[in-house]
């Protein structure tokens, strides 16, 4: 049973829209310095901006002003594939064909957090709130990028005859593969407003920003807007 003055344990279910950004510091494609790696990864894969809709569940305790809660969420997997071809004709004889194939996956596997929230009681119904959150998050990502360059030699034929294209005499391929897994403790902030439908049931609209931390050359941040209900026992 709920305690007096709005105190007691509670559960909350939310549907969250997350704007996700994952940033990689890959070596530049033109890097030639000692100890660097030539990469064909495009800027698109360096700064991934995507979004997802996911559920979140929380359990906590309301102290009548302050609340603490533990929450858990899983995020969807992101996939992307890019392919491009360019053909250049040099000196009317030499043709160079460049093919780029890039594949990427991104999975914010899970987030387990603990938050402390303070409710501002404006009246009997509306309660804006702010808070802080610490969470243990798991993020996976992988990139597979290849660049293939093929050279053809074209020679002019006899008068009225079609030119002759020789078999490829130059074929080079560069590859860049990378896979990282982040398991870090990150920090975030929370804000929102609650509307009491009944003394025990609250409609909650919230926002949270979370920095998931950094592993080597990978940084991951999310901005989330959510709508849910909170039931206090």
UniProtKB/Swiss-Prot annotation:
InterPro entries: OM_autotransptr_brl_dom, OMP/PagP_b-brl, Porin_opacity. This is Opacity protein opA67. Its main location: membrane. Residues 1 form the signal peptide. Coiled coil: none annotated. Pfam families: Opacity (PF02462). One of its GO terms (cellular component) is cell outer membrane. Implicated in a number of adherence functions. OPA proteins are implicated in pathogenesis and are subject to phase variation. Keywords: Cell outer membrane, Membrane, Signal, Transmembrane, Transmembrane beta strand. Gene3D superfamilies: 2.40.160.20. One of its GO terms (molecular function) is porin activity. It is found in: Cell outer membrane. Belongs to the opacity porin family.
């Amino acid at each position: 049973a709920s305690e007096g003055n709005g105190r007691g344990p509670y559960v909350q279910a939310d549907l969250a829209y997350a704007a996700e950004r994952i940033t990689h510091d890959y070596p530049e494609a033109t890097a030639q310095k000692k100890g660097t790696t030539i990469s064909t990864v495009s800027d698109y894969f360096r700064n991934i901006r995507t979004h997802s809709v996911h559920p979140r569940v929380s359990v906590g305790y309301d102290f009548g002003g302050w609340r603490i809660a533990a929450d858990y969420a899983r995020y969807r997997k992101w996939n992307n594939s890019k392919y491009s071809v360019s053909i250049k004709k040099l000196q009317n004889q030499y043709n160079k064909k460049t093919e780029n194939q890039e594949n990427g996956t991104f999975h914010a596997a899970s987030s387990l957090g603990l938050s402390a929230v303070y409710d501002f009681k404006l009246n009997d119904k509306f309660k804006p709130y702010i808070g802080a959150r610490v969470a243990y998050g798991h993020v996976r990502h992988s990139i597979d990028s290849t660049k293939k360059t093929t050279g053809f030699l074209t020679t002019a034929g006899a008068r009225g005859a079609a030119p002759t294209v020789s078999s490829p005499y130059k074929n080079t391929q560069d590859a860049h593969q990378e896979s990282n897994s982040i398991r870090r403790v990150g920090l975030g902030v929370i804000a929102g407003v609650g509307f009491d439908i009944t003394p025990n049931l609250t409609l909650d609209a919230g926002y949270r920003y979370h920095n998931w931390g950094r592993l080597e050359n990978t940084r991951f941040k999310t901005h989330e807007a959510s709508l849910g209900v909170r039931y206090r026992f």
